[in-house]
């Protein structure tokens, strides 16, 4: 498989179960090591590098809201952990008034009331609130590549729409290069400038711009059945 993601691309990746979507994402993230070939992120060869090493440039939001946050810690403490890449921060630093105010401002942008729950343990948040927090944490450092691993699949339809709208707003505002794995054809068609279909470990379709905008769900369903 040869795939180049250009800076600023928002790529939706679709495919049947077992097509290779998760393998592709896990290889980029570093949880799987390819048998051959080379992988570069932001100009750095990372083929054999660890997840921790790649985290300098790559952030990931998982399908399970619990995986991107620490449930026993407060909302503010989770945000402090997410800022570890920007410098050495104490978990107690959030108690400072200026830190709390900044966090409240960030959380208010999510429109989920989390700005009023800085000291609440994350395990008491709803799935949508927790996933929104995960998304905020993953993008605090403005990563070179944001990986979204079916990040709305565990949410109810309304919350899924809210998190997707939030995703688009953050990606657009920060001009983030993004790869989103999704089973929802409507999301794949609605969001992003590029759509990639994976089948049997190969790229079956790769469209962008106006060509993507012209696609209909029926077109994609036809490709799935081929």
What label would you give each PLM region?
Residues 29:
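Helix-to-loop junction immediately C-terminal to a conserved catalytic motif
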Residues 73-85:
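Q-loop/switch helix immediately C-terminal to the Walker
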Residues 182-183:
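H-loop/switch region of ABC-family ATPase nucleotide-binding domains
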Residues 202-225:
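Conserved beta-strand-loop-alpha-helix hinge in the C-terminal portion
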Residues 14-16:
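The feature captures the beta-strand-to-loop junction immediately N-terminal to the Walker
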Residues 45-59, 67, 89-92, 96, ...:
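ABC ATPase NBD coupling module
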Residues 37-45, 205-207:
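Conserved ABC transporter NBD signature motif
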Residues 138-139:
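ABC ATPase C-loop
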């Amino acid at each position: 498989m040869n795939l180049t993601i250009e800076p600023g691309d928002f790529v939706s990746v679709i495919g049947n179960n077992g097509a290779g979507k998760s393998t592709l994402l896990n290889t980029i993230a570093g949880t799987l090591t390819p048998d051959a070939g080379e992988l570069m992120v932001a100009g750095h060869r990372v083929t054999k590098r660890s997840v921790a090493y790649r985290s300098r440039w790559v952030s990931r939001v998982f399908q399970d809201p619990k995986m991107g946050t620490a449930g026993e810690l407060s909302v503010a403490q989770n945000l402090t952990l997410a800022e570890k890449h920007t410098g050495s921060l104490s978990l107690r630093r959030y108690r400072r008034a200026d830190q709390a105010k900044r966090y409240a401002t960030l959380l208010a942008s999510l429109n989920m009331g989390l700005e009023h729950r800085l000291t609440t343990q994350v395990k008491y948040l709803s799935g949508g609130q927790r996933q929104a927090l995960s998304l905020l944490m993953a993008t605090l450092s403005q990563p070179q590549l944001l990986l979204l691993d079916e990040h709305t699949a565990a949410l109810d339809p309304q919350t899924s729409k809210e998190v997707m709208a939030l995703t688009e707003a953050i990606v657009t505002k920060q001009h983030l290069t993004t790869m989103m794995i999704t089973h929802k054809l409507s999301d794949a068609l609605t969001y992003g400038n590029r759509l990639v279909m994976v089948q049997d470990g190969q790229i079956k379709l790769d469209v962008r711009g106006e060509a993507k905008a012209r696609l209909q769900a029926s077109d994609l369903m036809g490709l799935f059945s081929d």
